[in-house]
């Protein structure tokens, strides 16, 4: 079974800032993922690049050292994801970042998808017909 864990904007911001009120909660999710990877579980932690931009995550900046160490993979807004995201945005009116996140959910090959988010309603909306686990922060 393959698992995909996707971060939304607030989860990314909380990872960076130890003073963020949700920092501990997001760190605890990240620790679970790291421990499962150590046990050779097929799990990947990702961030859509539009979410990364919205959060201000510059991988070259020393301010983002902790998220950079977690080996969170970028999911680019390529042609296919852009078309899906545009359709999601047109249907729902969500932000570009949330639409990109929805495109990642809808195109994922993983058996199980989890989204760490501060907006569970929007994540269920952009997921379309895909079953997702929403970890609300």
PLM features: what roles do these ranges have?
Residues 54, 84, 125-126:
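Phosphate- and divalent-cation-binding pockets in alpha/beta enzyme and binding domains
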Residues 43, 71-73, 113, 132:
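Short, conserved active-site loop motifs that form the nucleotide-linked donor/cofactor pocket
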Residues 51, 71-92:
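Acidic catalytic patch
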Residues 1-45, 56-70:
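Short, well-structured N-terminal submotif of metal-dependent ribonuclease cores
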């Amino acid at each position: 079974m393959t698992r995909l864990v996707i971060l939304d904007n607030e989860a990314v911001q909380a990872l960076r800032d130890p003073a963020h009120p949700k920092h501990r909660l997001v760190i605890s999710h990240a620790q679970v993922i790291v421990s499962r990877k150590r046990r050779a579980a097929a799990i990947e932690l990702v961030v859509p690049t539009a979410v990364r931009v919205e959060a201000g995550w510059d991988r070259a900046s020393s301010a983002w050292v902790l998220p950079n160490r977690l080996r969170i993979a970028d999911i680019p807004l390529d042609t296919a994801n852009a078309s899906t995201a545009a359709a999601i945005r047109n249907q729902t009116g969500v932000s570009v970042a949330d639409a990109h996140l929805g495109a990642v959910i809808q195109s994922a090959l993983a058996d199980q998808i989890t989204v760490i988010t501060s907006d569970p309603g929007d994540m269920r909306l952009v997921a379309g017909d895909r079953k997702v686990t929403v970890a609300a922060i």
